[in-house]
């Protein structure tokens, strides 16, 4: 696990994506380890092309008018694919356009190994999107990455992970409640506690029994700690 925090083993990621959809995807992968004895997850970056038509649509959506390139005879060029991505830092580190995951699970309860592959745009993802929306055939992902995953695996002896397990991510509201509950429970002082409580109100979670209960409990603990400190 420590290797995942090495700078040589990470890529630049959209902040909203990292804190929301990708985070919920990783939580789903961790939950798989509670269901199956052997879970293997491979993640990585992708730089995928867009058709000229796609770029024109995207530019127009942003209010920018972009005309197709023209030939010398006045006819428009045939659309072609290009890869476009930003770079960051003084070393101009390339920011991937997409991220991928290959998730495989094995267990005695399964007739065959189960596996699914996903390609997720490195950008904010709509709250109504599901993980299955980004599922792709493993062969398609391999053609884009240039690698063959689980090369010794008999592809005919594998079932689809999402068909067996559902690939259901935690709902966005439950996701927010999870982190706010944890933040309130571990708040180190009243200021930190109140900050999480304001978040609970903002997401309309302050009336949830578990959130309210842990807030009142932690508030009493911090109040007692303050009183004990003042008495010494």
For each feature predicted by the language model, list its residue ranges:
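Repeat-associated, polar segments at repeat-unit boundaries in modular proteins
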Residues: 200-232
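Domain-level detector of nuclease and nuclease-like folds
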Residues: 1-196, 202, 226-232
């Amino acid at each position: 696990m420590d290797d995942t925090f090495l700078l040589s083993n990470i890529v630049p990621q959209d902040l909203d994506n990292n804190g929301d959809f990708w985070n919920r995807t990783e939580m789903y992968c961790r939950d798989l380890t509670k269901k199956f004895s052997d879970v293997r997850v491979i993640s990585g970056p992708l730089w995928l092309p867009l058709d000229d038509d796609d770029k024109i649509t995207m530019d127009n959506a942003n209010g920018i008018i972009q005309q197709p390139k023209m030939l010398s005879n006045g006819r428009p060029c045939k659309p072609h694919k290009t890869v476009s991505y930003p770079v960051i830092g003084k070393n101009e580190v390339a920011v991937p356009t997409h991220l991928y995951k290959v998730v495989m699970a094995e267990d005695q309860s399964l007739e065959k190994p189960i596996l699914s592959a996903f390609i997720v745009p490195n950008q904010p993802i709509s709250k109504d999107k599901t993980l299955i929306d980004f599922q792709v055939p493993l062969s398609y992902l391999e053609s884009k990455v240039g690698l063959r995953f689980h090369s010794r695996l008999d592809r005919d002896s594998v079932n689809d992970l999402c068909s067996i397990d559902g690939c259901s991510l935690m709902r966005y509201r439950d996701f927010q409640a999870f982190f706010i509950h944890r933040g309130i429970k571990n708040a180190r002082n009243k200021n930190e506690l109140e900050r999480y409580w304001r978040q609970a109100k903002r997401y309309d979670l302050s009336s949830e029994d578990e959130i309210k209960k842990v807030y009142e409990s932690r508030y009493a603990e911090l109040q007692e700690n303050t009183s004990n400190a003042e008495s010494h």
